[in-house]
Amino acid sequence: MTGPSPVDRARTGSKHHLLTDSSGIPLAISLTGGHRNDVTQLLPLVDGVGPVRGKAGRPRQRADRVLADRGYDHDKYRRELWKRGVKPVIARRSTEHGSGLGRERWVVERTFAHLHNLRRLRTRYERDDSLHLAFMLLGCAVVCQRRLMAP
């Protein structure tokens, strides 16, 4: 996986993109090359989630809001989220650290930590993307099972 720029080719490996609910249950996951921009995966992740069950009544078709770090900051994608009825809560690249977004984003970071506690996902050994994605999906199933079975 190499990018169009010689600078992009230096970034090896892959990136995991994850969308969770407020309790840390993985809802959607994707895999990209290490040289790809994070923001390209924002809309496919949001679109990959079906109806969200919650309180009694009709299930919501989408999440109310999306929290993301600075890698997903782009005005075009913010507008697209608003069009879909999702409030973007994304840190701006120009703001300093300590904006308070981390108080809510820790749930996603904790889910990444649970995934990377599985030795097979911590270091990528597979050359084939589909095989690595399969292990990521299996890891998400393990995280869901552990989360749902917790007292």
Model-derived regions, located:
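Polybasic low-complexity intrinsically disordered regions
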Residues: 1-93, 100, 139, 146
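Basic, amphipathic alpha-helical segments enriched in Lys/Arg and hydrophobic/aromatic residues
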Residues: 79, 83-85, 98-151
